[in-house]
């Protein structure tokens, strides 16, 4: 161990063992009694397949006794046989770090998968198992990070150097939202970004790579993937690979790093698979008993220090839309901001489908965001909360039974609900609307005008899928013009019809 508590990443003389048993991605290896490898050490062996010889990497997970260790494979074990020689590398999995990885696509082992040759200038390799920063090294500075997305900036602001969770069930827009955040922040911020795909679709990774290359931000981004089709060991460790690369930029280069992780649920799911393969007794709902420890080991490394910061955005799949499921529930405790995606809003075509009442942030405080921002956010939430309370009455008795004051609140809430929608740059091909990046000052001012009732006379449709209040006014003028044209056309048709009858 070096003085900072991490392994130095330099290989030591390790022992040589032989494969005893292969059970899918789990491999048992026997070593000489005086050469038993440590937990988390990386082992390598050669496999002969029809495609030729390649190296398989294993990670030690258990010491079984009788000179045997149980390991998990980082890639397919097809072609592996009993008796194959296994080399202990004498260190954990170590991945390349530094500016050489920017613009590259890597796997869990730090090997390039973008067919652009080896990573050049590998000046350093860091082990993926490292301790979290010490308490005295952490930064406590609270500052807002502008995302350009109105509903997030206003109601659940992002803390610079904090952690944001994007919670949602299947198909409600988590990946689209995280891709838009990458587009907005990477383009505006022009800093270093690290994207880690954990157990998600290969298609999405390919699309993201193409979009980043087209936008010109790939040169400042490292992409690390452990996709759906890979063994659980790769999906379980790829998150640590991404964090390790981000830590180098923070600790050595002193940078403010953006860390995107899609999807943290797949990390828990892969850990569940590994735990079952190890023969451990599951806990509630079938999850591994070590879920909290594993999540904490990852999350506590994603933090800000006095040297630099890591601002992370994590997509969190919510199984069956149940937020009490142990996997998303375990993530909650580590976050500074939670962005809840609502299936109900998604069905109403409010995009992004962020639930303004369920979402929250620890920095939505007058001392951090300012008094005006805080007051506007609370007024918006208050109006939407009252609208939610009135919906049952409206459904049973109708809106006409409400008091005049409540009718005004309902109308204003519906405008606010639509105004929280926004056209995305990454969804332009689907909406045919140009994307909008809304500055924080414009967001606060626009919503202040709406909650004060300055635009109660404008149609609800004018507030839908627009940027700031100027876009609302422009859309209202267009709608008014279209309505007048429609009335004139109707009059002309009526006149032609009357003339035809007269003849």
Swiss-Prot record:
CDD domains: ATP-synt_F1_beta_C, ATP-synt_F1_beta_N, F1-ATPase_beta_CD
Keywords for this protein: ATP synthesis, ATP-binding, Cell membrane, CF(1), Hydrogen ion transport, Ion transport, Membrane, Nucleotide-binding, Translocase, Transport
SMART domains: AAA
GO molecular function, one term: ATP binding
Subcellular location: Cell membrane
UniProt region (Disordered), positions on chain: 478-503
Disulfide bond annotation, renumbered to this chain: none
Any one of the GO CC terms: proton-transporting ATP synthase complex
Entries under HAMAP family matching the protein: ATP_synth_beta_bact (MF_01347)
Membership in a protein family: Belongs to the ATPase alpha/beta chains family.
Protein name as annotated: ATP synthase subunit beta
């Amino acid at each position: 161990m070096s003085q900072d508590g991490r392994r130095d990443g330099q290989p030591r003389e390790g022992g040589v063992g032989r494969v005893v048993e292969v059970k899918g991605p789990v491999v048992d290896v026997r070593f000489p009694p005086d050469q038993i490898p440590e937990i988390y050490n990386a082992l390598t062996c050669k496999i002969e397949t029809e495609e030729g010889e390649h190296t398989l990497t294993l990670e030690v997970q258990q010491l079984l006794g009788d000179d045997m260790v149980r390991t998990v494979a980082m890639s397919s074990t097809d072609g592996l046989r009993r008796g194959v020689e296994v080399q202990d590398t004498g260190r954990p999995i170590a991945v390349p770090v530094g500016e050489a990885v920017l613009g590259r696509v890597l796997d869990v082992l730090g090997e390039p998968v973008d067919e652009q040759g080896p990573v050049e200038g590998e000046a350093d390799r860091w082990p993926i198992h490292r301790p979290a920063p010490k308490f005295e090294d952490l930064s406590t500075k609270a500052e807002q990070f502008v995302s350009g997305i109105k509903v997030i900036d206003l109601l659940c602001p992002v803390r610079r150097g904090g952690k944001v969770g994007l919670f949602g069930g299947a198909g409600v827009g988590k990946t689209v939202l995280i891709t838009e955040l990458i587009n907005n922040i990477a383009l505006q911020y022009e800093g270093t970004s690290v994207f880690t795909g954990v157990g998600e679709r290969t298609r999405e990774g390919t699309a993201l790579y193409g979009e980043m290359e087209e936008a010109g931000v790939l040169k400042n981004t490292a992409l690390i993937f452990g996709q759906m089709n890979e063994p659980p060991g790769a999906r379980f460790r790829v998150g640590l690979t991404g964090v390790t690369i981000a830590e180098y930029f923070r600790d050595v280069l002193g940078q403010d790093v953006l860390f995107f992780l899609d999807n943290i649920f797949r990390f828990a799911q892969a850990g569940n698979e590994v735990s079952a393969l190890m023969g451990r007794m599951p806990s509630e709902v079938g999850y591994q008993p070590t879920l909290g420890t594993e999540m904490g080991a990852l999350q506590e490394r994603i933090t800000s220090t006095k040297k630099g910061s890591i601002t992370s955005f994590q997509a969190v799949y919510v199984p069956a839309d149940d937020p009490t499921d142990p996997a998303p529930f375990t993530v909650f405790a580590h976050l500074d901001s939670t962005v809840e995606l609502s299936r109900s809003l998604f069905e109403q075509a409010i995009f992004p489908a962020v639930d303004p009442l369920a979402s929250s942030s620890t920095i939505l405080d007058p001392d951090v965001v300012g008094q005006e921002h805080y007051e506007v956010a609370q007024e918006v939430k208050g109006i939407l909360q009252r609208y939610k309370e009135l919906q049952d009455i409206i459904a049973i008795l109708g809106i006409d039974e409400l008091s005049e004051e409540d009718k005004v609140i309902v109308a204003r809430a519906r405008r606010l609900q639509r105004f929280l929608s926004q056209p995305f740059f990454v969804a332009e091909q689907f909406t045919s609307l140009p994307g909008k990046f809304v500055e924080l000052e414009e967001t606060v001012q626009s919503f202040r005008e709406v909650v004060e009732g300055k635009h109660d006379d404008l149609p609800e449709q004018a507030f839908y899928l627009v940027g700031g209040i100027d876009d609302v006014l422009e859309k209202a003028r267009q709608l008014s013009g279209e309505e007048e044209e429609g009335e004139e056309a109707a009059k002309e048709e009526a006149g032609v019809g009357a003339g035809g009858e007269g003849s």
